């Protein structure tokens, strides 16, 4: 039986999630995307947005449009690889979306608007069974990072969950390996050098709450905030309060990189850390954590579906005499593509656990 999914918000992440489903051969086989929701319902425009992408290139699948019924004025249905997806008008209150009528079980909440648990619960009142927020969430929604704490999902108690942020999905696997392999973290500082996103300005504009954030994204390196490091403490409790960080938004359209400087809880070496991360990337963190020892730059990671790709050539150790605990490690991530694949993975994981619990 296929998983019935609705995507609320067919913007950057919503479309990338949909494309990930298609590229992985899941659409119509394991997952049935019943509907996508956005401010307009013009399927022809949605089709155009999917066909052509300035970063990830042309859509690799067949896409056309049709009408859901003869009485509608414009095409309101996408047809992708022969599968029909209804385009639904966005609502101020998610409870007003017709999830129950459409048979949708799992909603991917990717508008960026309903990130508080109580607001996202509107989807449940609309007839959905579960909600995955594709952003950091507040108000008591449990946060999951695939490969790190996804097995803590409780089908009977957790109905609205968060897939964390793209940066947390890059950082948490690194920290998970460091903790699991016994290196530990006494304290650490993280910086993400992050590509600009849709919330930024193309030219200098008004940004009353974040003055620097109002400057032209493609012309500046912009210091910013991130909750990614602190969020790691939510998924790896032993690191609670030990990590904090900041961001630099930079003039690239996609791919970001995490720089983690930390003090281990025991003496170790670059060689030992490198070996542990390489081993993890081939075993228990495969397809989540990657490893590279090549001379790569950001463009080389565009459309990489892994959450975090550790750069072994960038690892540093403090050069003070007898210092064996102070290190810097670096990891790349496609902040769009890798993250979108983890959203899909989380939905699949939840559905499998829900079926096992006979929900």
From Swiss-Prot:
| Anything else known | There are two identical genes that code for glycosomal GAPDH.
Return the protein name. Glyceraldehyde-3-phosphate dehydrogenase, glycosomal
Is Transport set as a keyword in this record?
A: no
Q: Record's SMART domains?
A: Gp_dh_N
Which reaction is this enzyme known to catalyze? D-glyceraldehyde 3-phosphate + phosphate + NAD(+) = (2R)-3-phospho-glyceroyl phosphate + NADH + H(+)
Has the keyword Oxidoreductase been applied to this entry? yes
Cell location: Glycosome
**What is a biological process (GO) this protein takes part in?**
glucose metabolic process
């Amino acid at each position: 039986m296929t998983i019935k999914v609705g995507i609320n918000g067919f913007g950057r992440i919503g479309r990338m999630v949909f494309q990930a489903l298609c590229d992985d051969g899941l659409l119509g086989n394991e997952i049935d995307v019943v509907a996508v929701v956005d401010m307009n319902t013009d399927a022809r425009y949605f089709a155009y947005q999917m066909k052509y992408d300035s970063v990830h290139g042309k859509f690799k699948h067949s896409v056309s449009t049709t009408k859901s019924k003869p009485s509608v004025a414009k095409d309101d249905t996408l047809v992708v690889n022969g599968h029909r997806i209804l385009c639904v008008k966005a609502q101020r209150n998610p409870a007003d979306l017709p999830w129950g009528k459409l048979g949708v079980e799992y909603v991917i909440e990717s508008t960026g608007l309903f990130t508080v648990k109580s607001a996202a619960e509107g989807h449940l009142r609309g007839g959905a069974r579960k909600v995955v927020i594709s952003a950091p969430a507040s108000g008591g929604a449990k946060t999951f990072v695939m490969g790190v704490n996804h097995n803590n999902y409780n089908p009977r108690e957790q109905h609205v969950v968060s897939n964390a942020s793209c940066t947390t999905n890059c950082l948490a696997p690194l920290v998970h390996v460091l903790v699991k392999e016994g290196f530990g973290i006494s304290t650490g500082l993280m910086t993400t050098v992050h590509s600009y996103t849709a919330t930024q300005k193309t030219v200098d504009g008004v940004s009353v709450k974040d003055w620097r954030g109002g400057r032209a994204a493609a012309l500046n390196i912009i210091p910013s905030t991130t909750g990614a490091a602190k969020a790691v403490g939510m998924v790896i409790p032993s690191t609670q309060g030990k990590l904090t960080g900041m961001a630099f938004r930079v003039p690239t359209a996609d791919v970001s990189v995490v720089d983690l400087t930390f003090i281990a809880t025991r003496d170790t070496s670059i060689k030992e850390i490198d070996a542990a991360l390489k081993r993890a990337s081939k075993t228990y963190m495969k397809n989540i954590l990657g490893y590279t020892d090549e001379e790569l730059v950001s463009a080389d990671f565009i459309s990489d579906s892994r959450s975090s790709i550790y750069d072994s050539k960038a690892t540093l150790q403090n050069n003070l005499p007898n210092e064996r605990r102070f290190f810097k490690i670096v990891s790349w991530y496609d902040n769009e593509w890798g993250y979108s694949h983890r959203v899909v993975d989380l939905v699949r994981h939840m559905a499998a656990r829900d079926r096992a619990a006979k929900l």
